[in-house]
Amino acid sequence: FVTPGIIDIHSHLGDYPSPEVEANSDGNEATSPTTPEVWAEHSVWPQDPGFARALANGGITSLQILPGSANLMGGRSVTLKNVPARTTQGMKFPGAPYGFKMACGENPKRVYGSRGRMPSTRMGNLAVNRETWLSAIDYANDPKAKRDLGKETLKGVLTGEILVHNHCYRADEMALVLDMAKEMGYKVSAFHHAVEAYKIGDLLRENDVCSAIWADWYGFKMESYDGILENAAFLQREGACVVIHSDDKNDIQRLNQEAAKAQAAGLRLGIDIPDAAVIQWITYNAAKAMGIEDMTGSLEPGKMADVVLWNGDPLSVYTRPERVWVDGALLFDANDPKRRPVSDFELGQPGEGDVK
């Protein structure tokens, strides 16, 4: 079986790399509820061993690295090609637009409310966001404004050059964010996690917003409590855009299995989703939400040759990548020990033989 290269729309490889120690924790600039001035690429460590594992085990050829969700506005995300490089600049996806990470709900109000500052409630979340957008609109309309890195990013969102990726769980909050986006004049490209997206599939379809979701992870906090296994299937039936994401260094190695689980959950309810549509959840739809669908995400003439050859049905738990090409270059071959990228960090470490 051959598929387009797998794309993970939500990853923290590099900004929360392995080994997971405090010294490497660089994903949340949790010093202010709005930090649009920070860029995830300035935290990415290209030697994170997770990149090679995502390629070899998951067939990941492109991925979006996002700031964390402590802040209402977490900063710019960056799209990378999953290629070995000494620098983050050497991994950046040519021509990919920047993303902008936002978060609603529990995380910002918990982080800043616990410090006795705003926001400490959901209404505080919206108020801080709206005030920040109003200031950005003034900046965007002032040709003589002094350069401001944060407002420059927000201006990019307002002009459509930077795509919004909004961490949000509850249906009512996603609807409020869409109201705010209309008020302020920007578009949400995707809601991430979105465990209650199934409740508003029609609204998401009408607003052309993708839902980047897990197959079966929910219930770990109150705002994620009302998740269902059929989230993806209900969204697909409604004609909304579905993306399966990882947000995890392990799940990124098996997004094909996650997509298959979501497909199976729908089938148990009588929603039969074709395999080709399911593969799009981890290829074309992700590319669309990231603004790179004209360059990758499907196997078409003129697109980047990001390709995975599987040793069986890619929607089977028993299947693994056999070969992976990025931009036409063979980067992984399961039958050739020399064709397996290894992080320089792992060389010379105990257990080195496991990765060579």
Give short role names for the model-derived ranges.
Residues 1-67, 71:
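Metal-associated gating/positioning segment near the N- to mid-region
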Residues 9-11, 65-68, 167-169, 193-194, ...:
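Active-site-proximal beta-strand/loop segments in catalytic clefts of secreted hydrolases
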Residues 13-16, 46, 68-73, 171-175, ...:
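Active-site environment of divalent metal-dependent phosphoester hydrolases
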Residues 18-19, 25-38, 163, 183, ...:
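His/Asp/Glu-enriched, well-ordered alpha-helical/loop segment
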Residues 50-192, 320, 326, 352-354:
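Polyanionic/metal-chelating signatures
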Residues 91-92, 200-202, 220-228, 320, ...:
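Short, charged, surface-exposed secondary-structure boundary motifs
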Residues 125, 335-356:
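Intein/HINT protein-splicing elements and their conserved insertion hotspots or analogous self-processing inserts
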Residues 288, 300-345:
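C-terminal cap of metal-dependent C-N hydrolases
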